[in-house]
Amino acid sequence: ALGPYADAEAEIFGEYLDRHVRYRVTHAPVLSDLVIEGVTLFQQDMLRTYIKMKTGQRIDLQQLHQDGEKILNRYHESGYVMADLEQFTVNLGTGNIFMKINEGHVANIHVTGHSRTRGWAILREMPLRTGDVYDANRVNRGIMNIYSTGLFESVTLHVEQKNSRPRLVIAVREWPSRIVKLGARYDRERNGEGVLSLTEANLFGTGSRLTGRAVFGDRRQRYILGFRSDRVFKTYITYRMSGYYHQDDRYVYDGLQQIGDFREKRSGLQFTIGRQLARLGAVSLTARVEGVEVQTRAGRSPAGRADIRSLTLRSQVDNLDRYPFPSSGHHHDVWLEVAGEALGGHQRFLRGYTSLAWYRTFARYLTIRPKFVFGIGEGEIPFSEQFSLGGIQNFYGYRQDQFRGAYLLQSSLKVRFNVLSGVYASTRYDIGGLWQQRQDFRWDDLRHGVGVGVGLATPVGPFEIHYGSASFGARRVYANLGYRF
């Protein structure tokens, strides 16, 4: 590096034993002007601060080279790793410095290895477009987005140079798109149940999912055909549509006594649109068109039909670390539903619901989970739409949906201990109640429940046995094997 000199020459002269060296140096000129071209990402005044020499000072070529490297480092540290100094010259006659920066604008983006998935369905997951400056952070996020669709076994990126501009080649390897799932579970409330799910996970190569699902058991049946898309064009808006038929056999109780048995049939259509929002989680709006028929099977039970047309605004946050037996994270579910004749239905009501639960583990083995639930219903709420209380996950000592009402207040505290790997012992205290009218609420009416249980994480799902007791002498043994569906 010549530093403050523009040129240097050495001349050796003299006889063999009397040699001399003469140096001729040319001083670098005084800085007259600095021109920077090709900059779109930063303010030029900010980049000029990296050039230590000021107008009127003699140019130091070594320092100038170091300053140019600092400008490149500024680009690279910001993720623009393809930026380069395309031209960096000093006019020794005028003292003008010319700097041209190639920021690394993407020449094009190409996808290979896909036989079924449409190219645009892959590229919409990449936040970088042709002509954008190559940003390593955005590229990495795009690769993760593509992989997260679940359509590909592997996703890799290759960067080539085309006319001094980066060309991106995304290589993918597709999973089979047709998926068949079988499952089964048992619990004391519904006995044995099975589930069959058939999914086309890449419908017409667009990344949309079409799923047919059937749940069949002694006391519950579900038949659902659903369509889901995680992207609307290039936005992050998701939507899903489903048509369904549900049939549930339920018991009716008067206090602790079972007095009847009824069958609840639901058939309808739902359309949901939503997206992920910071802090609010998955926010969605659902339109529901549904017919509900309640038929008496035995004893005393409600009967009738309801035609429901409703809109539901919902926010869900779920960052639990695992299922089952989570050890950290929280689960929040908040929604507000409005049904009325203006929407084409026969029932007019408003329902609001909030469920908040937190998991935290201490000393690796002890997990605490507080939970709070609140529900409110106003208007002509059909029996089938009322809140319920009871069951292994809901309220110890009572059976599933043993109590119903338009107003719900409930809280619980669960303590779980990791006895061995995959073996858990737990206890839980529940407090809560249901009321048909607001004016019926009294603190003295709150019910109390307490229980203990043992759970095992098995290859076929959780196996749990619990015992619970509640107010007024209610006692219940619970047992279940398999994942809930």
Regions of interest found by a model, annotated:
Residues 33, 87, 108, 154-156, ...:
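Extracellular/lumenal ectodomain signal focusing on beta-strand-rich modules
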Residues 14-16, 27-29, 92, 115, ...:
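A generic beta-sheet turn/junction motif
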Residues 41-45, 62, 70, 116-120, ...:
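Gram-negative/organellar outer-membrane beta-barrel architecture
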Residues 440-453:
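A short alpha/beta connector and helix-capping loop motif
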Residues 179-182, 300-437, 481-484:
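C-terminal outer-membrane beta-barrel translocator/porin domains of Gram-negative envelope proteins
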Residues 27-34, 103-109, 174-182, 232-234:
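Short, charged/polar, Gly/Pro-enriched secondary-structure boundary elements
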Residues 1-101, 116, 120, 126-129, ...:
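Post-signal-peptide, soluble extracytosolic/periplasmic N-terminal scaffold domains
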